[in-house]
A protein has these predicted regions:
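Single conserved hydrophobic/aromatic residue that forms the stacking wall/gate
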Residues: 1-12, 167-169
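Short loop/turn motifs at secondary-structure junctions
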Residues: 7, 27-28, 50, 93
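Solvent-exposed polar/charged
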Residues: 4, 24, 45-49
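A structured beta-alpha segment of the ubiquitous adenosine-cofactor-binding alpha/beta core
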Residues: 13-29
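Periplasmic-binding protein-like
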Residues: 30-34
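ALDH superfamily catalytic-core signature
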Residues: 36-167
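ATP-dependent adenylate-forming carboxylate-activation enzymes
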Residues: 6, 13-17, 67-70
Length: 169
């Protein structure tokens, strides 16, 4: 006998009224949110009225740390998997990399080499490893971030521009 729990995952953006209705519903048994602290506080207040179970991951800024005794090939493989899962649009996707000075060059070279091999394309194509971002707004934010960091002195080691063959609709 299998105990299968039904789950529904919804991505709700800019729709407070929908979230309020879902939280108030007797159908919803648990709320899980990944998002900002501001939105988390609002949802927690609404859920408190029903003493609703809530799990939150708020405002994550996950570091990826590589010490001097690390297996660099394994660390690079793990970094690629963590950073590019769902195009980095995951709350636990690393935003900062701290690499021991003695391992930095080797790690960076491996990371670039492995990133070059990732297939960018249509998210519906099973062979695609990097598909589209969730919204055009997010795409613009990332392009602005790249430009800002370059202006502040960052050096782009790979890419830095959207592939011309891909169009965001």
């Amino acid at each position: 006998h299998l105990n299968v729990r039904r789950q529904r995952q919804m991505c709700i953006r800019d729709r407070p009224s929908i979230a309020q209705q879902l939280i108030a519903s007797d159908i919803v048994k648990k709320i899980s949110i990944t998002g900002s602290s501001r939105v988390g506080k609002l949802i927690l207040k609404q859920a408190a009225d029903k003493v609703q179970r809530v799990t939150m991951e708020l405002s994550g800024h996950s570091p990826f740390i590589v010490f001097d005794d690390a297996d660099i090939k394994k660390a690079a493989d793990m970094a690629i998997a963590a950073k590019f899962r769902n195009n980095g649009q995951v709350c636990i996707s690393p935003n900062r990399f701290y690499i021991h000075e003695r391992k930095k060059d080797e790690f960076v070279n491996l990371f670039i080499e492995k990133t070059k091999k990732l297939k960018i394309g249509d998210g519906m194509d099973p062979s695609t490893q990097l598909g589209p971002l969730t919204t055009k707004k997010r795409l613009n934010e990332i392009e602005e971030l790249v430009e800002k960091t370059k202006e502040e002195g960052a050096k782009v080691l790979l890419g830095g521009k959207r592939p011309l063959s891909l169009i965001h609709i």
